[in-house]
């Protein structure tokens, strides 16, 4: 079948070579020239930075106040223990955060299998070494495991509440991604007479909490969802103008009675239909002096009260009165 030069090829052959339970090689071909790197790089970035997973985010070790401590009877120092905790491959079924405990004493190796698990928590690598104990060694820990995405440094989870947390709760930089290694190569491919096509080979290894094939599938789904917005992209022939009322300072909506003026001044203002502070500040001194029974003494009082609130006479409000201010409100003000 002859293929038009203007027609884009889509991959017809997908091969999955399972190297181990945690590693696979996925081959995708044929691809138009350049699309191997385009898709390979996009999938690689998503696999490394956007895949959800679980990791230890906090550890509390008996007798340890900070990460630069050493524990009697334990071969590793605290920093080494924390590094080993980062290697745990954990799955949470249902919850987003759990607290687990580990208690071990006496000579021997402390592994992930020594962690006491809840019914909805699974450790994929139970043989993972956490520490080595001497005959007098004792290791008691509380581990907080959380669900997340990508890489999250310890200080990004700290808040004002963390300042009051008990000393000895050690925060860990956490890599939630189940992907341990991802690499891709682009090789030459051929379809009929076209020899300048691409073949994408992805070599992917996970920590065992997620199957490599499923990881690729999820990464492709994320990419597809992000690009979906561009598929239906269309510009409006005429921009839609949404009329939005400018925000008004709440103090302007308060009645003039809140200014606590003298009875004489307040009655003079109401006689001129000045019910709200927003009504008042738009009047000038000349206008107010024309008000019956309102003299210079009352005017000075009004100016001083407005100044104490950062206001003055003669101000202009383009959006006054607001639509939310009903006429009935003035009658009851």
Swiss-Prot record:
- Give the record's keywords alphabetically: DNA-directed RNA polymerase, Nucleotidyltransferase, Transcription, Transferase
Chain positions covered by the region annotation Alpha C-terminal domain (alpha-CTD): 248-333
Q: Which GO terms describe its cellular component?
A: cytoplasm; DNA-directed RNA polymerase complex
* One Pfam family named in its UniProt record: RNA_pol_A_CTD
Map out region (Alpha N-terminal domain (alpha-NTD)) in residue numbers.
1-234
User: One GO BP annotation here?
Assistant: DNA-templated transcription
Q: Which residues form a coiled coil?
A: none
GO molecular-function term, one example from the UniProt record: DNA-directed RNA polymerase activity
Catalyses which reaction? RNA(n) + a ribonucleoside 5'-triphosphate = RNA(n+1) + diphosphate
Question: Is Transferase a UniProt keyword of this protein?
Answer: yes
Claim: Transferase is one of the keywords in the record: yes
Entry's EC annotation: 2.7.7.6
Family named by the database record: Belongs to the RNA polymerase alpha chain family.
Q: What does this protein do?
A: DNA-dependent RNA polymerase catalyzes the transcription of DNA into RNA using the four ribonucleoside triphosphates as substrates.
Please provide the record's free-text comment about the domains of this protein. Answer: The N-terminal domain is essential for RNAP assembly and basal transcription, whereas the C-terminal domain is involved in interaction with transcriptional regulators and with upstream promoter elements.
- Its name, as the record gives it, is DNA-directed RNA polymerase subunit alpha
Tell me which species this is from: Pseudomonas syringae pv. tomato (strain ATCC BAA-871 / DC3000)
Q: Which gene encodes it?
A: rpoA
């Amino acid at each position: 079948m002859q293929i038009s030069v203007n027609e884009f090829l889509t991959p017809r052959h997908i091969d999955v070579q399972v190297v181990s339970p945690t590693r696979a090689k996925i081959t995708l071909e044929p691809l138009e020239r350049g699309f191997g790197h385009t898709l390979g790089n996009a999938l690689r970035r998503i696999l490394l930075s956007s895949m959800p997973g679980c990791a230890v985010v906090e550890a509390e070790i008996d007798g340890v106040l900070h990460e630069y401590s050493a524990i009697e009877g334990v071969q590793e120092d605290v920093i080494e223990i924390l590094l080993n905790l980062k290697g745990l491959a954990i799955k949470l079924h249902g919850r987003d955060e759990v607290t687990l405990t580990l208690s071990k004493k006496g000579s021997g190796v402390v592994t992930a299998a020594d962690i006491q698990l809840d019914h909805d928590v699974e450790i994929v690598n139970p043989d993972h070494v956490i520490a080595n104990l001497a005959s007098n060694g004792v290791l008691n820990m509380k581990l907080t495991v959380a669900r997340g995405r990508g890489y999250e440094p310890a200080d990004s989870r700290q808040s004002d509440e963390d300042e009051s947390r008990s000393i000895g709760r050690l925060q860990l930089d956490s890599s939630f991604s189940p992907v341990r290694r991802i690499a891709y190569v682009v090789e030459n491919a051929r379809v009929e007479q076209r020899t300048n096509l691409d073949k994408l080979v992805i070599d992917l290894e996970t920590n065992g909490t997620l199957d490599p094939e499923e990881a690729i599938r999820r990464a492709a789904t994320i990419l597809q969802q992000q690009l979906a917005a561009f598929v239906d992209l269309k510009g409006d022939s005429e921009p839609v103008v949404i009329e939005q009322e400018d925000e008004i300072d709440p103090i302007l909506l308060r009645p003039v009675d809140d200014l606590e003026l003298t009875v004489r001044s307040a009655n003079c203002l109401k006689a001129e239909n000045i019910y709200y502070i927003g009504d008042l500040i738009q009047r000038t001194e000349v206008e107010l002096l024309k008000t019956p029974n309102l003299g210079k003494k009352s005017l000075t009082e009004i100016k001083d009260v407005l100044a104490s609130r950062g206001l003055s006479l003669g101000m202009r409000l383009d959006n006054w009165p607001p639509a939310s201010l009903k006429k009935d409100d003035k009658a009851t003000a």
